[in-house]
Amino acid sequence: MILVIDNYDSFTYNLVHYVGDFGAEVEVRRNDDIDVRDALDLQPEKIIISPGPCTPKEAGISEALILASTVPVLGVCLGHQAIGSAFGGQVVKAPSIHHGKISSIQHDGTQIFEHIASPCKVVRYHSLVVAKDSLPEELLITATLEDNADVIMG
């Protein structure tokens, strides 16, 4: 089962449907509707932290669950920022705001990017990013903007 933490964003269910299309069992819980212990007691194989309209510090159990998890965690938008923040990275305003804008990213071809060409086009919906120079050693950068390698995309 894949546990999706919903940070009150309409895009959450797009993710749920995409994951479901691959045959995965998905359970969705709101970020303030479950605590970390109960989330881990569900024994998810993977966790997805969804986008949302707030900062990582305001995203319920997101950061605490990231730190407590022993299974792979995928963070999308706010979830990505929460991973960086949970490990001590700084979340800052993006160099430019991109809501519904297409950008090219380059990636290392590993894991989630394994069968995706690099560079590739993605749609961005965020105004905050994890500052590259604040990223702790525990986290590896797997994707950046093609035209600005300082903007982390994975």
Feature-to-residue mapping (PLM):
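Catalytic beta-strand/loop cores that center a nucleophilic Ser/Cys/Thr
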Residues: 111-154
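Short loop/helix-cap segments at secondary-structure boundaries that form the rim of catalytic
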Residues: 20, 39-41, 83-85, 132-136
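Structured catalytic cores of enzymes that bind and process phosphorylated ligands/cofactors
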Residues: 8-15, 19, 26, 73, ...
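Short gly/ser/thr-rich secondary-structure transition/capping motifs
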Residues: 27-33, 56, 103-106, 122-126, ...
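Generic structural signal for residues in well-ordered beta-strands
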Residues: 26-28, 91, 141
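N-terminal beta1-alpha1 cap of cysteine-dependent amidohydrolase-like domains
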Residues: 1-68, 78
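Cysteine-nucleophile active-site neighborhood
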Residues: 44-114, 119
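Alpha-helical elements of the RecA-like P-loop NTPase motor core of helicases
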Residues: 13, 37, 81, 85, ...
